[in-house]
Amino acid sequence: IVSVFQGYFVFLVTYWAIHDIPISRLTTSMIQIPALLTTMMLMSAYPITQVYQHKEDRKRGDFTLSLRLGVLGTFHFTALGFVITALGYVSYFFYYHDSQTMLLYLILMIPLLIYYIFWYQKVIKSIDLADFEHTMKLNRLSALCLNAFFLLLIIFNA
C-alpha cells in the first residue's frame, strides 16, 4: 500500500500539478505507465532497505518480505525487480520519447548497477556485509542517479 501511494499516487499528483492538465488526462498510457513503473521500482527496492535488520525483525516478531526471502533471496528479488523495471522504463522512453532519453537513463543507471553487483559479491563472501552502511550507500547512489536523470531531462526539455 505504501509503495502505491509513494509511487503511483505521488507520480500522478506531481504530474498533474506540474503540467496543469485536466485530471482526465491522467488516465492515458503515457502517464499511467511511468506511474506504475515508479510503484514497481519502489516495491522492488523496499526489501533491500530491510536486509540489514533481519536479526532485529526476527527478535521483534516482524515478518518482513526481506526476512522471508533471506539475505540472498532479497538481493535476487531486488535485482529481478530492478531489471524488469529498467526494461519497462527503457521501453517507455523509446516508445514515448526518444532514444537519447533512453540512453541517458541507461547511462545514469550504470553506477547503481556496478555498486549493486559489487555489494552482492561482497555479501556472497560475508553475509555480515548486508549491513546498514552498504544499504544507505545504495540508497544515496540511487537517489543521486535518478535525480541526475530527472534534472537532465528537465534541462534538455526546457
Where do the language-model regions lie?
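Hydrophobic residues within alpha-helical transmembrane segments
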Residues: 33, 80-83, 141, 145
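Solvent-exposed interhelical
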Residues: 39-83
